[in-house]
Amino acid sequence: MLFDNKNRGALNSLNTPDIASLSISSMSDYHVFDFPGKDLQREEVIDLLDQQGFIPDDLIEQEVDWFYNSLGIDDLFFSRESPQLISNIIHSLYASKLDFFAKSKFNGIQPRLFSIKNKIITNDNHAIFMESNTGVSISDSQQKNFKFASDAVGNDTLEHGKDTIKKNRIEMDDSCPPYELDSEIDDLFLDNKSQKNCRLVSFWAPESELKLTFVYESVYPNDDPAGVDISSQDLLKGDIESISDKTMYKVSSNENKKLYGLLLKLVKEREGPVIKTTRSVENKDEIRLLVAYKRFTTKRYYSALNSLFHYYKLKPSKFYLESFNVKDDDIIIFSVYLNENQQLEDVLLHDVEAALKQVEREASLLYAIPNNSFHEVYQRRQFSPKEAIYAHIGAIFINHFVNRLGSDYQNLLSQITIKRNDTTLLEIVENLKRKLRNETLTQQTIINIMSKHYTIISKLYKNFAQIHYYHNSTKDMEKTLSFQRLEKVEPFKNDQEFEAYLNKFIPNDSPDLLILKTLNIFNKSILKTNFFITRKVAISFRLDPSLVMTKFEYPETPYGIFFVVGNTFKGFHIRFRDIARGGIRIVCSRNQDIYDLNSKNVIDENYQLASTQQRKNKDIPEGGSKGVILLNPGLVEHDQTFVAFSQYVDAMIDILINDPLKENYVNLLPKEEILFFGPDEGTAGFVDWATNHARVRNCPWWKSFLTGKSPSLGGIPHDEYGMTSLGVRAYVNKIYETLNLTNSTVYKFQTGGPDGDLGSNEILLSSPNECYLAILDGSGVLCDPKGLDKDELCRLAHERKMISDFDTSKLSNNGFFVSVDAMDIMLPNGTIVANGTTFRNTFHTQIFKFVDHVDIFVPCGGRPNSITLNNLHYFVDEKTGKCKIPYIVEGANLFITQPAKNALEEHGCILFKDASANKGGVTSSSMEVLASLALNDNDFVHKFIGDVSGERSALYKSYVVEVQSRIQKNAELEFGQLWNLNQLNGTHISEISNQLSFTINKLNDDLVASQELWLNDLKLRNYLLLDKIIPKILIDVAGPQSVLENIPESYLKVLLSSYLSSTFVYQNGIDVNIGKFLEFIGGLKREAEASA
């Protein structure tokens, strides 16, 4: 159970060893492996090379000796490899040497000594990677091997090559890229979900830049794919055999096992990587970098870390990668050894340890974003790692927040008057807006412009760092290499200097100006960030919405915006009030084209969802908010979405609390803030984790952080109790009741299938008079013009299965199911479906090709803006001008754009929009929080949640019924007011819905701002709270006085104001007449007097 603290004290009291005392030396940490058969194997290799005849006889032994004795490869490698494989490696290396001399002679250039890039992958998931790099020196022993070459190409060429190599030894070429095969190791082994855990060892030849990497599939004592559970006590004692690769465990010292056990414990306790640097106890010239993290929580991290060594011109001697088969999470540990006496001279000037400390700091940054869009600028060392990540994030920000429309578009709209029924002009304007947004300043254009102006980006980065890098004194900063580099950059003193600089170097009609100015706006909008916190899983920013969202495009400025960038996603969170509630949705894209479309719309979608939520939340104390996480293309699996969600949440928490286990951050906000999340598309299964995680991170508001939790945590699952669907169904049923359709057959179309919350409950709650004609969901399209079997649909809904599991034997001759994976199939009416996904995505506009008519359409799923002015004509009868679907209840948020809603109603459709129909879930969430606030912890755990057996308490069951009743009541009240006002003045229902929400929210804000009722009429205040607002069953448990003491005063105020505002408007309409309001309050006062 969530409240069980029995294990926490024991773990905290464990005697945690010091990492510095456990790293002895590379020779001691890993035992020297004795391979008795090495000499015999060596002779077999010589024989094989001799038989093959590629290497001259008098050079074979020298080449073999060099490989066996000069590259620093330990005997463990030789014991595991066959003579055939070793001979192949030696052939590859020898061929590269020949290549050097041939190019020196014929091209007149001095190429790298070992210009080699080769990989060998065997059938047993074993691989060897060989790659050279610049900065190669040439040893005397190697020169003996090349005596033949001097005869062939001449001593002058050889001597010239040696001089060049010697020069490179002193100063590594800044333009040289890091090892390119490192990213292939990531892709083939570390990030490949079909690949089992592996063990990796890399060796750098002491006198060259030749890197040899050996990868082996890990072998565990207990090869359980689910991993092995292991206690913290065992980890700290180094008892890790059950989760370790057999070879690693065999060759590791006891100290090394304890060290790895400690790192594993630290990784299990918190999110993100554990990164440590220590000197070896026995070899003071040796420094060891250790990085531990959960596998699949980042991508291309191995290559990113190696590129960091390259950037700081550090040369490791050995790189070990160990994988551990831990329950729930495979954990990877990098163990990298560096010797000071093997480093380049210019590295020694600024201290190897200082460089490694900088690597330690930036390894956390690269864990969050291992691949950035400015890799080439970074490789040229024109950007530091931090500058490259800053530019990467800045480019994403610019792509989403740059004002592409400009003043010309705004001036155009000010010169024309668009009537709401002029769909042609509305469509032209919408198309122009979309074209301006989609076809100007692509992401790549932004990146190219920023790369060109890298010096300006560096100056803006310094402006950003000067504000947000938290430090006690400049003296502390001067110790880091990044500060020493930053000190050389002159920032912009103010906006005037920035503008003058741009005007001096960039033409005034260049798009570069807009890009760079938007990056400056990004800097100014940042109120807090975790960018400089070392242990982070993604990078988060709290932005000032007044600076990044123009009034022209976003008429109502939000209260706050969060912006999060991770290695597999970008995320946003928009809220319209300080205390606000809304779900977090995940948007997946199966391919790049879909991703590009989703990316273009994500900010508008997030804003519209949050705005809709603000209107939906008119009945509850909290304002509206919404979060959207957009995953990189192709990431659609459950575990991939969870990683993104968990990193999004953790990064947000970083800048919501002051975590004593992390560094401080600069907070430019005048007060602390709290966010309240809820489930939405793709995140319903993650809310329990987020609740527990907030508790683990000691968030004081963890109980109310997430709603829709499992009942064992005090949550009320929306899907299990149909909370959202109850509101939608109330509107459907009221339409039938009002228009006398209850006993008439109604033909129905639904998007969102029986596997989802809204779709399944809509099926289960459907009335007997409804006949389903078509349903579509993530698996495809199910349609039957003669009606779908209701019992079969209910079976799928109960089992939460997709329509792909529908028993097609129960379809008529004209019925069909088309999978999203289908291609080139013929339907019963002769229609050819070329692509199943395209057919599914457009079926809602094509349905009348397969059915004669539809009476009611209930969208319960689907992408926002699925019906727009651009496809409106599919829903309008050309002959009559009437809407082909007479009734629409928009259960899915934003399924229909507001202009399209107006147009549909103009053509006679009776349409109830999302902000009215889809508000049951937020009511449930709000009342879930109310229960946790009204009851003390003891009552909440033992009386509300109940025992640990899973049986829900009587109080819980009664409260659920209370919540369901309130949802239906609020929906029916709003329906009545919407219907009456529509009948009274003919205003479109969707417009009245907006006016209703605005009126309630405005009155609510005015009442919150006023202290009159709260301070001066305690009798009325307490009567309303205890008799009208807070459910009686909670008061019966806690007592009236305790309830009022348990709930924070600020929350009681908004409880009172939201009740008064919504109740008044539902009774009196959208005209807030002061006389009517006084009468309303007077009536409540008389009720309070009568009840006294």
From Swiss-Prot:
Matches recorded under InterPro entries: Aminoacid_DH-like_N_sf, Glu/Leu/Phe/Val/Trp_DH_C, Glu/Leu/Phe/Val_DH_AS, NAD(P)-bd_dom_sf, NAD-GDH_2nd, NAD-GDH_euk, NAD-GDH_N
GO cellular component: cytosol; mitochondrion
Disruption phenotype annotation: Leads to rapamycin resistance when grown on glutamate as the sole nitrogen source.
Active-site residue numbers: 626
The organism's place on the tree of life at top rank: Eukaryota
Free-text description of this protein's post-translational modifications in UniProt: Phosphorylated by a complex containing the NNK1 kinase.
Alphabetized UniProt keyword annotations: NAD, Oxidoreductase, Phosphoprotein
A Pfam family assignment: GDH2_N
EC number: 1.4.1.2
Catalytic reactions of this protein: L-glutamate + NAD(+) + H2O = 2-oxoglutarate + NH4(+) + NADH + H(+)
GO molecular function, a single term: glutamate dehydrogenase (NAD+) activity
One GO term of the biological process aspect: glutamate catabolic process
Assembly information from the UniProt record: Homotetramer. Interacts with NNK1.
Note: Present with 7400 molecules/cell in log phase SD medium.
Family note: Belongs to the Glu/Leu/Phe/Val dehydrogenases family.
Function: NAD(+)-dependent glutamate dehydrogenase which degrades glutamate to ammonia and alpha-ketoglutarate.
Protein name: NAD-specific glutamate dehydrogenase
Organism placement in taxonomy: Eukaryota, Fungi, Dikarya, Ascomycota, Saccharomycotina
